[in-house]
Amino acid sequence: LTWEDLPLDAIRDAFIFWISVTGLSKEPSRSAHHAALGTRDRRRFTIADLDYRPMFWKDKETAHREVSRILPKVTVAIGNREECEVAIGERDPERAADALLEAGVELAIVKQGLEGTLAKTRTERVEMPVTSVETKNGLGAGDAFGGAICHGLLSGWSLEKTIFAASTAGAIVSSRLECST
C-alpha cells in the first residue's frame, strides 16, 4: 500500500481517523501514513496508537524518531508506559502525558495495566482505576479499549465517561477466553 492508493478525500473528511505507529516502521507504509496525516491536517480526532512492536523496528531509537515526527500531526495519542517511553522518552504516566501534550497532542492517554489509566488534556486530568476482572486472555483488550475511546469521542462524552467505558470494555474482553464475544 502506497500513498497513491489512499482515498485521501475520505481520510480528510472522516469524523475520526486512527493510525498505529507500527505502520511507520517500514516503507512504503511510512510514507502512506505521512500522506494520510498530512491530508488530515490535525483535524479533530486524529488518533495515534503508540502500539510499539519491537519485531517490526530496527531499534527503539528509530521508532522514537519516527513517532516523534507524527506527534505534532495528531490530536490524540494512546499508549502504555513502554510505548510512551519509546515515543517520547518518559515512562512515568504523569510525565509521559505531559510530554505528549508538549509534543502537540490535545489528549494524552496512558494505559497502566493493573494501575488503571491516566488521561490528560491541557485543562483536564482523569485517573481511572482498573476495572477489576479475572483475566483469562488479554488478546483484543486494547482493541476494545480503543473502540470505546472512539465511541466516547464521537458521542461527545466527558473524558471521565470515555475513559471509564474504555477501561470497562478492555476488562470485559480480557475476562473472556475468546476476544470476539
Cite the ranges covered by each PLM segment.
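Ribokinase/PfkB-type carbohydrate-kinase core domain
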Residues: 1-126
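Conserved phosphate-binding/catalytic region of the ribokinase-like
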Residues: 38, 89-181
